[in-house]
């Protein structure tokens, strides 16, 4: 029987918590950022979320109206100049009879300056700058795994079905990545030139 990815995700987080792993936030891309998922995560795992949201027809309760993100964006004045974000609004997520307050922050898309991206957080006390900074960590993790898969043979080099062999392979690939990161930093970071600025 196939299970929904969102149900499996909730199970994985609950099992991680059961063995003592903790985190401040769960970071998602837009795939998992539906109001239903965010509310379920808060209810079942008692964790706040920071996620990218899709510009689709998903409705958020904003100033007494059910609006999608494009409608919320067009209804509000944007911050001008070199601000880190364009818009920040508080909304309410709805699922059946349940409601959860959240904050949506819209930022410029770095790859297309005329476009914008929307981030959501269920921690309404989190500042806009901190929300953007924390979500940026998720992108660093994506780049890390893409590099490991594409260049360091994380997926293709080891064909074993032994747990120990797979674990050793992952450790070797991650060590390769760390060595390359240190070499890159030493070659590119001005602070490391001739050991002058340590």
Where are these regions (language model features)?
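Single, function-defining residue in the core of a domain
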Residues: 1-198
